Amino acid sequence: MANVNIQAGAGEGLQEKLVAVRRVSKVVKGGRQFGFTALTVVGDGNGRVGFGLSKAREVPVAIQKSMEQARKNMRKVALNGQTLHHPVTAAAGAAKVHMQPASEGTGIIAGGAMRAVFEVVGVHNVLAKCIGTNNPINVVRATIKGLTALRDPKSVAAKRGMTVEELLG
């Protein structure tokens, strides 16, 4: 149940999105105890992103805990303007995601949980496909794993002892 919600003015200019809320249950001697799990993504729109997954008895508490966790787990992503530097594939669990850069004006061509991650990180032009499971938790994990694996040409050239012009041909 991918419920998407934007909360403006959250912290230091961060964008927060609620990706999914699930009802979970714990079976005890007296019956079932119900709780909620919230999955959120947080980004600054300029190459930083994090996700949070938390449980609580009430939905608002689960969302709040998840947002706090997402803010603590933020990572830097190397972007090429409003798109990616190169195609990348990543996996988490049974979710495999493939992302590739797109030209200006293409937009975000991605589904569900991947779209929320791209919107908060600041990517506006990307082609993406999720293969395998569409479980939002694993899709978000795989997407962030792929984005953090991106390398800009400057750092790759420095690591290889070349100039950027030599690297790009």
From Swiss-Prot:
Keywords: Ribonucleoprotein, Ribosomal protein, RNA-binding, rRNA-binding. One of its GO terms (biological process) is translation. Residues 14-77 form the S5 DRBM domain. PROSITE patterns: RIBOSOMAL_S5, S5_DSRBD. Pfam families: Ribosomal_S5 (PF00333), Ribosomal_S5_C (PF03719). One of its GO terms (molecular function) is structural constituent of ribosome. GO terms for cellular component: small ribosomal subunit. PANTHER family: MITOCHONDRIAL RIBOSOMAL PROTEIN S5. Part of the 30S ribosomal subunit. Contacts proteins S4 and S8. HAMAP family: Ribosomal_uS5_B. The N-terminal domain interacts with the head of the 30S subunit; the C-terminal domain interacts with the body and contacts protein S4. The interaction surface between S4 and S5 is involved in control of translational fidelity. Belongs to the universal ribosomal protein uS5 family. This is Small ribosomal subunit protein uS5. The lineage of its organism: Bacteria, Pseudomonadati, Pseudomonadota, Gammaproteobacteria, Methylococcales. The gene is rpsE.
